[in-house]
Amino acid sequence: MCNNEAKMSELLSVQSDAPAKKINLMDLTRQQMREFFKELGEKPFRADQLVKWIYHFGEDNFDNMTNINKKLREKLKAVAEIKAPEVAVEQRSADGTIKWAMQVGEQQVETVYIPEADRATLCVSSQVGCALACTFCSTAQQGFNRNLTVSEIIGQVWRASKIIGNFGVTGVRPITNVVMMGMGEPLLNVANVVPAMEIMLDDFAYGLSKRRVTLSTSGVVPALDNLSKMIDVALAISLHAPNDELRDEIVPINKKYNIKTLIDSVNRYLNVSNANHGKVTIEYVMLDHVNDGVEHAHQLAEVLKNTPCKINLIPWNPFPEAPYAKSSNTRIDRFQKTLMEYDFTVIIRKTRGDDIDAACGQLAGDVIDRTKRTAMKRQFGQNIGVTEVN
């Protein structure tokens, strides 16, 4: 049985065991939705129509889908629904950035819209909280509760698109790029992140270019090695340190997959990817007198000498009780210039949305149950949240 058929059988078996529970069509890729319609005794092309209604037109009411006959609409209403996360809180920054706290069950995750002159980027969450315990990140301090479902991930894009609306009417630039850089580690939720990204790329849905969908990871190497077999999207690596001793401290997953292991995996991905223009994005948060010295820049250049990349230097964004300080502009500039001497492309990322705690590393959401992270920490020590991928 193929993966799509297995998925549909699982969904439909749940449906038969619990008739009151409807299938959320946002949990299905277009191919899975075609299988769903076949199970209903309908033509598979109906899936193409549904996907276009849901994502192109932002429609979640079957009655408004005028090219679908009434009998089928009634059948769909009986067994299916179209349900995206609702906005619990919206905050708007003076610089145009918008942060939404999206309600997912009893918890909330955060989604950030970042408009620029020539594009608009949506930063999407993949988990409720995060289990990786990076010491400089607010999300990690909230603990971990669970993975988001496909509908909770793609639903963030749907909800944001619905709010932003038509550029000609609202004056707000439509979403052109999606980055999986919100709450959570995407490669610890591959089963739901990949289908959500497939919907982003689908021409019947959002039709984004693979170069405009970026997955950011702290380095879950087995999942990264498998990623290219599942989907081709742009890749960003949350590196943040140039040596294992320091990275073990601030990005604890490094104890499981060290820098060399991670960079080797990145190079393998680049060898088969068409989405990255031959380069990976390296993310490096600047922590005052921790990882921002000239010696660190030289070490980073050595680590990346055989990896085509561009380097984003990210001014650290404070959060309560954090043990760090923000690097001075002088230290960041010196770090950049040192790397540029090695002919790297180095960009100092402009901080956006920090007045509403929407900047990099500040997303926290509302993680009610932290017991899972505590239990995982007891079992694995600092290597929490690491799942082997076959």
Swiss-Prot record:
Q: How is the cofactor bound?
A: Binds 1 [4Fe-4S] cluster. The cluster is coordinated with 3 cysteines and an exchangeable S-adenosyl-L-methionine.
Name the needed cofactors. [4Fe-4S] cluster
InterPro entries, A to Z: Aldolase_TIM (IPR013785), Methyltransferase_A (IPR040072), RlmN_N (IPR048641), RNA_MTrfase_RlmN (IPR027492), rRNA_lsu_MTrfase_RlmN/Cfr (IPR004383), rSAM (IPR007197)
Q: What is its EC number?
A: 2.1.1.192
Name its GO BP terms in alphabetical order.
rRNA base methylation; tRNA methylation
Which Pfam families does the UniProt record give? Radical_SAM (PF04055), RlmN_N (PF21016)
- What are the disulfide bonds? 123-360
The residues the record assigns to binding [4Fe-4S] cluster are: 130, 134, 137
Q: Which PROSITE patterns does the UniProt record give?
A: RADICAL_SAM
Which GO molecular function annotation, any one, does this entry have?
Answer: tRNA (adenine(37)-C2)-methyltransferase activity
Keywords, sorted A to Z: 4Fe-4S, Cytoplasm, Disulfide bond, Iron, Iron-sulfur, Metal-binding, Methyltransferase, rRNA processing, S-adenosyl-L-methionine, Transferase, tRNA processing
Q: What reaction does this catalyse?
A: adenosine(2503) in 23S rRNA + 2 reduced [2Fe-2S]-[ferredoxin] + 2 S-adenosyl-L-methionine = 2-methyladenosine(2503) in 23S rRNA + 5'-deoxyadenosine + L-methionine + 2 oxidized [2Fe-2S]-[ferredoxin] + S-adenosyl-L-homocysteine; adenosine(37) in tRNA + 2 reduced [2Fe-2S]-[ferredoxin] + 2 S-adenosyl-L-methionine = 2-methyladenosine(37) in tRNA + 5'-deoxyadenosine + L-methionine + 2 oxidized [2Fe-2S]-[ferredoxin] + S-adenosyl-L-homocysteine
State its location(s): Cytoplasm
Supply the PANTHER family for this chain: 23S RRNA METHYLTRANSFERASE, RADICAL SAM CORE DOMAIN-CONTAINING PROTEIN
Q: What else is known?
A: Reaction proceeds by a ping-pong mechanism involving intermediate methylation of a conserved cysteine residue.
Name of protein:
Dual-specificity RNA methyltransferase RlmN
Species: Haemophilus influenzae (strain ATCC 51907 / DSM 11121 / KW20 / Rd)
Q: What is the lineage of its organism?
A: Bacteria, Pseudomonadati, Pseudomonadota, Gammaproteobacteria, Pasteurellales
